[in-house]
């Protein structure tokens, strides 16, 4: 069951809090609550980068956007308990387990008076985002159904290529190259842009035009860098066809799209802090304004 309330502030690698109460309305900030791919990896070897699965928050003007609901969503939820009531727009790239497993533990969704607008694509088998989030909370997987959530949940089905307007926030979507499909999101506000592009596999012979277009001239690109080229093309255990990309492909995309800053995301569960330190050094040698995502890290878009 979800936490009823945090007994103390959840420790994070950053001092930033998920609050909009004292934020200027000119702020456009990206904050990372879960940066790991596939499965959560708590432990002493993942302290600096974090072990929670995918969850990214964007705060811009009066809007709060949440991308994916991995285990990092639980941590974000505990921070949101400090500022009720909460309204947010939640966008799911897809519904592989590491992107939805935190949703049943998202405490604010159980509290009346909160409101969450939830978006996701219809799956190839025809199921909606509502049905897939609800299904993981059915017996024998979870003790209570989604109907126990007392917040106002408003579900919206998307088709890749859709463009949404949330007042002065523009959100563009694009199809990504991932098993059972995934969606990338481009968020533009006040003339500045952040792109959430995870769970996508590059093409070996060309750049992905969908991703380049989505990332065009972005201030910040969050990109799936689950593997290194050495892992991806490994003769004995290749990862071709697994639906993920490399930091090297991310740098190629960033250069082709004119991206200002790239943040490598969706770290492989086998990559510990020391390994990721080495990857970050290589990334920065290839693209000066590049880095790896860390839990708690905040990046100003403006």
Question: How should each PLM-predicted stretch be described?
Answer:
Residues 121, 199, 267-268:
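Short strand-loop junctions, especially beta-strand C-caps/beta-turns
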Residues 67, 93, 198, 223-225, ...:
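Active-site flanking residues adjacent to catalytic metal/cofactor-binding acidic residues
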Residues 2-195, 203-206, 211-212, 277-302:
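Binuclear metal-dependent hydrolase catalytic cores
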